[in-house]
């Protein structure tokens, strides 16, 4: 091969190595910082949550979910940062495999949830009922439930009768809340003054007799129907979750290939020079990074 063509190929190889290296460093660092932020928010929320009597179910504790998500993002991204800086093949492979496993597990989880849709809905409804039992004791769940009921115009998990699981809303309970639902279940115009007593004495009545007063459909089905009607938003959310992980796997795989090519090139060069000979190719730098040779 003419010397000019050889130098051009070498320059392209060097450029691709550096481009992949810095792209992977930026990718890992961004998600490392995001993981640290999510973890910090989760820890702060959990500290605040512990000041009050709260839910025992980790599924319904947003702070616990944030902490777990933050820990996973922080640790995995840290491996990616360290691997890309050191050009360590073992760490790079570990980073790629972890991302790939997470991606596959998410896809499998989605397929299982769709395949066993009825069981998934029952699982969600059961957890919502457990949350309703502690509605007035857990501010996190209360705020989430109130928001969902107002936003999606629904009441309870399966339907409005789920509120009988709460000790204050049970029909046998003393007090004005008995046999009623929270005011966020009520049908009202935005211009009207909020009537916090609008949902009283509705649980023990039939759907048709209260459907003009409160929302009778459950929030689980309401949210599912909303996502089906707004499939573009759902597709955007799925892409936002899955695409970065896929790009991370692809980027790491390409970078591993380039690092292996460099190692192979150096091995061949050293073998041709013979034992004890000084190679003419010198490293461009040392330290935290394995730099591409000049």
Curated annotation (Swiss-Prot):
Q: Which residues lie on this side of the membrane: Cytoplasmic?
A: 1-23, 84-93, 257-294
Might you name a Gene Ontology BP term for this protein? protein maturation
State the InterPro entries in the record.
Tetraspanin/Peripherin, Tetraspanin_animals, Tetraspanin_EC2_sf
Q: What is its main location?
A: membrane
One GO molecular function term of this record is:
enzyme binding
Post-translational note? Palmitoylated.
The way it spans or sits in the membrane comes to: Multi-pass membrane protein
Q: Which Gene3D superfamilies match?
A: Tetraspanin
What keywords appear on the UniProt entry? Answer: Cell membrane, Disulfide bond, Endosome, Glycoprotein, Membrane, Transmembrane, Transmembrane helix
Pfam families from the UniProt entry: Tetraspanin
Q: Which GO terms describe its cellular component?
A: cell junction; cell surface; cytosol; endoplasmic reticulum lumen; intracellular membrane-bounded organelle; late endosome membrane; nuclear body; plasma membrane
Q: Which residues lie on this side of the membrane: Extracellular?
A: 45-62, 115-235
Q: Which residues cross the membrane?
A: 24-44, 63-83, 94-114, 236-256
Question: Would you list which residues are glycosylated?
Answer: 118, 189, 230
The cysteines covalently paired via disulfide bonds are: 154-219, 155-185, 171-179, 186-198
Q: Where in the cell is it found?
A: Cell membrane; Late endosome membrane
Q: According to its UniProt entry, what is the function of this protein?
A: Part of TspanC8 subgroup, composed of 6 members that interact with the transmembrane metalloprotease ADAM10. This interaction is required for ADAM10 exit from the endoplasmic reticulum and for enzymatic maturation and trafficking to the cell surface as well as substrate specificity. Different TspanC8/ADAM10 complexes have distinct substrates. Promotes ADAM10-mediated cleavage of CDH2. Negatively regulates ligand-induced Notch activity probably by regulating ADAM10 activity.
The protein's assembly and partners: Interacts with ADAM10; the interaction influences ADAM10 substrate specificity, endocytosis and turnover.
Q: Which family does it belong to?
A: Belongs to the tetraspanin (TM4SF) family.
PANTHER family attached to this UniProt entry: TETRASPANIN, TETRASPANIN-15
According to UniProt, the name of this protein is Tetraspanin-15
Gene field = TSPAN15
């Amino acid at each position: 091969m003419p010397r000019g063509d050889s130098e051009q190929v070498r320059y392209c190889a060097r450029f691709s190595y550096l481009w992949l290296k810095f792209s992977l460093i930026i990718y890992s660092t961004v998600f490392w910082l995001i993981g640290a932020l999510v973890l910090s928010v989760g820890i702060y929320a959990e500290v605040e949550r512990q000041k009050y009597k709260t839910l025992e179910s980790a599924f319904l504790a947003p702070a616990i979910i944030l902490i777990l998500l933050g820990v996973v993002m922080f640790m995995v991204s840290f491996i990616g940062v360290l691997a890309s800086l050191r050009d360590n093949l073992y760490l790079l492979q570990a980073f790629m495999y972890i991302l790939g496993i997470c991606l596959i597990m998410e896809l499998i989880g989605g397929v299982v949830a769709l395949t066993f849709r009825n069981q998934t809905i029952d699982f969600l409804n059961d957890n919502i009922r457990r949350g309703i039992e502690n509605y007035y004791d857990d501010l996190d769940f209360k705020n989430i439930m109130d928001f969902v009921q107002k936003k999606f115009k629904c009441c309870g998990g399966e339907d409005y009768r789920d509120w009988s699981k709460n000790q204050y809303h049970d029909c046998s309970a003393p007090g004005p809340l008995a046999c009623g639902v929270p005011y966020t279940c009520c049908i009202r115009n935005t211009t009207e003054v909020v009537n916090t007593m609008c949902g009283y004495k509705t649980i023990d009545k039939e759907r048709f007799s209260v459907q003009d007063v409160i929302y009778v459909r459950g929030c689980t089905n309401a949210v599912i129907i909303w996502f089906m009607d707004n499939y573009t938003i759902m597709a955007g959310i799925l892409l936002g979750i899955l695409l970065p992980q896929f790009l991370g796997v692809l980027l790491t795989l390409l970078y591993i290939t380039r690092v292996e090519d460099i190692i192979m090139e150096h091995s061949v060069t050293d073998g041709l020079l013979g034992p004890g000979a000084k190679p003419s190719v010198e490293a461009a730098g040392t330290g935290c990074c394995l730099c591409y040779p000049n």
